[in-house]
């Protein structure tokens, strides 16, 4: 659910000590292989000196837009051995800007008079974005919906009301069927 909601998460997973892994004990498993399908970034620290740098990198990876899952695997000895220094979290690149041609196409579609759904997700569900989406919907006739899974949706008095797209595919198709155009904002 964290991945669906684009929530930044750092998982720290314990592993056998580096010198014990070669013995292939009964509880030894391919943690990287297990973590990879559910993580955007996976790294195993090889020694105590790498833990702070790898940890800082895991934080930076999780902070990337739109929110990612980073898994850092720490063999036991990397966690209990001494390290000589810490690390600074690397800067995170700014999110990509929207292509101006895509914006022009959205404007064209919104002005077309054809049925348009504006599907909001992630930061599109925050107060400022909701306010803008409400204005766009009011002036264009677009209908607002939100994703079925969201980390946070700002609601309450004076906020724009949204209908969530159902999680069940058949129901979601029924909701989207009347629309000729779908514009994604954070979704």
Question: Where is each model-derived feature located?
Answer:
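N-terminal alpha/beta PP-like core and its mobile active-site loop of ThDP/TPP-dependent enzymes
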Residues: 1-187
């Amino acid at each position: 659910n964290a991945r669906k909601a684009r929530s930044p998460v750092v998982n720290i997973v314990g592993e056998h000590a580096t010198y014990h892994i070669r013995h292939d004990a009964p509880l030894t498993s391919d943690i990287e292989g297990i973590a990879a399908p559910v993580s955007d970034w996976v790294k195993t620290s090889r020694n105590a000196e790498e833990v702070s740098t790898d940890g800082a990198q895991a934080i930076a990876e999780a902070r990337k837009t739109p929110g990612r899952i980073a898994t850092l695997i720490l063999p036991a000895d990397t966690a209990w051995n001494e390290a000589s220094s810490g690390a600074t979290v690397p800067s995170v690149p700014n999110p990509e800007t929207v292509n101006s041609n895509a914006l022009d196409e959205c404007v064209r579609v919104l002005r077309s008079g054809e049925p348009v759904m504006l599907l909001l997700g992630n930061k599109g569900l925050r107060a400022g974005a909701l306010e803008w989406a409400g204005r766009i919907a009011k002036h264009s006739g677009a209908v607002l919906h939100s994703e079925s899974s969201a980390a946070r949706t700002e609601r309450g008095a004076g906020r724009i009301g949204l209908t969530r797209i159902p999680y069940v595919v058949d129901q979601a198709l029924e909701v989207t069927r009347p629309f000729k155009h779908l514009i994604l904002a954070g979704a």
